[in-house]
């Protein structure tokens, strides 16, 4: 039996909430909270006939730590699942620490304002020291490890599929299947067809920033950065067929390099159709990728 507060009600959050409601013996009570409560109410109404999980809803601005703290205190959950935007990771982690509640998310922190001078100074220092220029990295959240440990709390970071299940697969392989692991290649393939010329599978802003950024991979103990989409491979996926895939920077490379230090090379590839790439480049050419006003 558990009470879970789920912050977020977008595409990824909706899938996670549906899956939680399929195991009501584990997730006995869920509160769905978002900036727009009407979205939470609609999802709760859809789920009500399908599950015995008790579902309530709430409004919260996850950018404001005091609002998150107030909601946690009111609902008293065992776990907060942060499936909002990665911009809000630190705010929600701070609220969990203040309230003594366990934390879980699906994507590591990146700032909403990448021009903030204080953040920029830390970022540029990390770029020089680490060797990759992605806006997102684990350093901000890993810095919370001691705080959560001293509070007797658990914080699970990147607990989606990739990152998340991918690291679990690698850890299982290391423990049970191999004496040592030399190389890791993660291949992310979407075999679906929604019929649209262009659409993202999760938050468009985050997706487009991730794909249009320089790629990078881990090799021989250091990062190698490359121009965006400059390494392409063709791969035939079981039950899906041949797809074009491109090397991207992805957060699990960072955690795998830390936890499987013997790996000589770690890479991440994702499949994209030509129509998606054409639309993305068009948006990029007119300055519509990024947070700057046009």
Cite the ranges covered by each PLM segment.
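C-terminal catalytic/substrate-binding lobe primarily of soluble NAD(P)-dependent oxidoreductases
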Residues: 175-293
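Glycine-rich Rossmann-fold phosphate-binding loop(s) that bind the pyrophosphate
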Residues: 9-10
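Helix N-cap at the beta1-alpha1 junction of Rossmann-like dinucleotide-binding domains, i.e.
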Residues: 36-39
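Rossmann-fold NAD(P)-binding glycine/threonine-rich loop
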Residues: 107-153
């Amino acid at each position: 039996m558990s009470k879970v507060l789920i912050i977020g009600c977008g595409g990824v959050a909706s899938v996670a909430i549906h899956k939680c409601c399929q195991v009501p013996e584990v997730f006995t009570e869920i509160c769905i909270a978002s900036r727009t409560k009407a979205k939470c109410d609609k999802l709760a109404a859809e789920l009500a006939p399908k599950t015995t999980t008790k579902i309530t809803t709430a409004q919260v601005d996850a950018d404001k730590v005091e609002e998150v703290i107030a909601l946690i205190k009111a609902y008293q959950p065992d776990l907060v699942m942060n499936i909002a935007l990665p911009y809000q990771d630190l705010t929600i982690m701070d609220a969990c620490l203040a309230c003594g509640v366990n934390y879980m998310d699906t994507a590591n922190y990146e700032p909403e304002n990448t021009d903030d001078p204080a953040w920029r100074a830390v970022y540029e220092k990390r770029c020089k020291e680490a060797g990759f220029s992605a806006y997102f990295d684990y350093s901000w959240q890993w810095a919370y490890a001691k705080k959560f440990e001293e509070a007797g709390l658990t914080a699970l970071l990147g607990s989606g599929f990739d990152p998340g299940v991918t690291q679990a697969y690698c850890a299982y392989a290391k423990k049970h299947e191999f004496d040592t692991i030399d190389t890791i290649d993660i291949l992310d393939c979407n075999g679906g067809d929604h019929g649209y010329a262009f659409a993202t599978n999760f938050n468009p802003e985050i997706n487009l920033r991730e794909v249009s950024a320089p790629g990078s991979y881990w090799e021989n103990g250091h990062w190698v950065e490359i121009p965006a989409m400059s390494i392409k491979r063709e791969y035939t996926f079981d039950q899906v067929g041949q797809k074009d895939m491109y090397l991207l920077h992805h957060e699990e490379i960072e955690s795998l390099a830390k936890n499987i230090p013997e790996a000589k090379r770690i890479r991440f590839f994702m499949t994209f159709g030509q129509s998606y790439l054409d639309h993305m480049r068009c948006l990029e050419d007119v300055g519509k990728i990024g947070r700057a006003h046009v």
